Structures are given as C-alpha cells and as structure tokens.
Amino acid sequence: YVAEVAEETIEEAPIPYTLVEEKPSFNGGDANEFTKWVFSNMVYPEVARENGISGRVTLQFTIEADGSLTNIKVLRGVDPSLDQEAIRVVSMSPKWTPGRQRDKAVRVTYNFPIYFQLRN
C-alpha cells in the first residue's frame, strides 16, 4: 500500500499593474468618459446636502483582465455619506476594456477622484 500526497497548489492572482503599455479604457474613451458616466449616475447624499458637505473622494480600484472592477476602496474620504455614494456608483460601472501588457489583458490598479460640489 502506497499513500500518495498530492501537493496542493494555490494559484494567486497576479499583482495588478500600475503602469501598462495600453491603459484600460471606458466605453472606448478615457477617464473623462468614466467621469461623465459617474456624474450621470451619482446622487448627492441628502445628509451631505443638508450639512453643506462637499469635497473630493479619491477611490482606488482594480480593473480586472475581464474588464470588471474589484477591490473598490476609499483612499481619501470626505464624509461617510459621500464616500459610500462614490463606492456605490463606481461599483455599478459597466465593464471596461482592460489594460494590456505584452498584448495580454492584465489587472490594473486605478486611482480615481470624484468631486462632490454643492451648487446653489
């Protein structure tokens, strides 16, 4: 009787790139296209509006090789209501065209500022 022990291999996802030969794109455009999409889907939180809270929320997320967004987190927040709205909107994003390195789709880390500004 011989017992065999199979070595278990855990395949870890490759670390996302920050610089790539071909940047990810949104709807065939650049970051400005994504900014337009974010603002068309954003709802200014009532509590922030009532308290006159505005500012810039900086998010970081990973654009996966399949174009989906993951690991969405706040790098620099303003107020929990604005931070949560920024995460909510970005998490609804349609798929991107992924970044490419050596002609292969790769994961890319992306930092994205969202400006919340009250208008009178």
Predicted regions located by residue number:
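A short acidic/small-residue loop/turn micro-motif
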Residues: 76-82
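A generic structural motif
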Residues: 75-76, 112
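A sequence-level signature for low-complexity, intrinsically disordered linkers and tails enriched
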Residues: 1-17
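Second-shell loop/turn segments in exported
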Residues: 21-26, 72-73
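Short proline/glycine- and basic residue-enriched helix-capping loop/turn segments at helix->loop/beta transitions
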Residues: 25-60, 85-120
